[in-house]
Amino acid sequence: MEEIFKNYPLLKNQNVPRETLIEFDLFISMLQEENEKINIISKETAKNEVIRERHIVDSAQIIEFVDLNSNIITDIGSGGGMPGIIISIMIKNQKNLAKVHLYEKSHHKSSFLRKVSRDLKLNTEVMQENIFEAEKLDSGTIMARAFKPLPIILDLVYKNFNSYKNLIVFMGKNGEKVLEETLMNWDFDFEKKKSITSEDSFLLNIKKIKKKN
């Protein structure tokens, strides 16, 4: 097996092409270099063997929930580009024309996202603004990873988006409790999928968000 495939064993059943994995590694190099200047991810997770699983594969696993028929896919708190940059790399190599909107209010992180997008020729638009102040947004898939608690994310999508196809949220070890409590105040259709990178985590694919009276 070629070395690049050995670097991503958890993606071996996902049919991820070689070109995509190569660009993942290019992105990792850029992220590690920038991380020496500004704190984007923790130093512990910036090592090659850790970053691939903790950040790259963790982000890539949501691709099956991403609506690839959308014109716009939105990452509502992009940070260092996970999952937005990762999904943009994947859809580029699927010859998909969807644009990924990356919301990040930090000047330094936004500049990094623009540089990565230019260097990897990604179809993204970096929005250096606080998404909570944005209004009347439209999107296909919306993605939220390590951003805000679930109720705040739901409230943001409910109030600030005119239309959307689905919302993907990464849930951590207290996710089941958070979901149960959130459903007391919110109504939505959802599908759960166990994370391939963590025993304690799962993904939520959410549609039709409504507030309970």
UniProtKB/Swiss-Prot annotation:
The keyword RNA-binding does not apply. S-adenosyl-L-methionine binds at G77, M82, E104, K105, S106, R145. GO terms for cellular component: cytosol. Disulfide bonds: none annotated. Keywords: Cytoplasm, Methyltransferase, rRNA processing, S-adenosyl-L-methionine, Transferase. Its EC number is 2.1.1.170. It catalyses: guanosine(527) in 16S rRNA + S-adenosyl-L-methionine = N(7)-methylguanosine(527) in 16S rRNA + S-adenosyl-L-homocysteine. Its main location: cytoplasm. It is found in: Cytoplasm. It comes from the Bacteria. GO terms for molecular function: rRNA (guanine-N7-)-methyltransferase activity. Gene3D superfamilies: Vaccinia Virus protein VP39. Belongs to the methyltransferase superfamily. RNA methyltransferase RsmG family. Specifically methylates the N7 position of guanine in position 527 of 16S rRNA. This is Ribosomal RNA small subunit methyltransferase G. It comes from Pelagibacter ubique (strain HTCC1062).
